[in-house]
Amino acid sequence: MHTIVLATQKGGSGKSTLAIGLALAAKEAGHTVRLIETDPQGTLSNWQSRRGIAEPMVETIYNVGRIEARLEALARGGVTLAVIDTASGVSAVTAAAIRCADLCLIPARPTITDIESSAATLKAVRAWHKPFAFVLNQTPVRGRRIDNAAHALRGEDAREMNELVARPFISMRNDHQDASASGLAVGEYAPTGKSAEEIRQLWRWAEARLNGLQRHSRSDAISPVRLASGVAQNAETAPAQPLPAWDACL
């Protein structure tokens, strides 16, 4: 079983909407999926209550001591993908989820405040040496601001671009909000729309990344954890460096 954790310091970045979209895209692709909610705000639970459909099941876990054991039980029960939605900030529960992740996705809108706020989440992810990627979310349909934000997030090493910033960027369209209000994922609400296709492509990107990490692990290759532009491998002994070029997003 693979575990994807969506985490970020700042609220309003679209973690829950992305979690729902990725879960349904993975289900469409044949996975047995479980959505796990660790955010007391209850966005996923409220979505499921509007949905009236059992799958994918949403589980709430607010106790830090339950996460690892529950993930192990889900794997034994045949679940192939767990998608964990977390509260804003880095609480003890969020830290536990990150510790169990195979891949951490850090959503960020293409704004200076979102990009700056991602540093705290990135520090927690690095502390556990977890593979991660930023997801540029709620972006304008077009414009230089998007690419500038992507370059600010990935740092100065162009070789890291494909791993540090997920593709495609997720554009801001009404389909996401309308789908959520209807208890649906965007791929169900408007299956032939551009938003649905972006989410499917994002899932394919994430799945390819997960499979690549698994292959590296099995072959005892160099660690797949990719750290941004020159940051030391051990986050506990080296000072974290700020993500560069914030003003490029303005």
Question: Regions from the language model: what does each represent?
Answer:
Residues 35, 84, 106, 134-136:
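Structural beta-sheet core signal
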Residues 177-203:
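Inter-lobe coupling/hinge region of RecA-like P-loop helicase motors
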Residues 216-250:
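P-loop NTP-binding site
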Residues 140, 150-187:
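Beta-strand-loop-alpha "switch" segments that mediate conformational coupling across diverse proteins
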Residues 3-9, 13, 21-96, 179-182:
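P-loop/Walker-type NTP enzyme "switch/lid" segment
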Residues 16:
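Walker A/P-loop
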Residues 91-112:
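Inter-motif core of Ras-like GTPase G domains
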Residues 113-163:
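Anionic-ligand binding region
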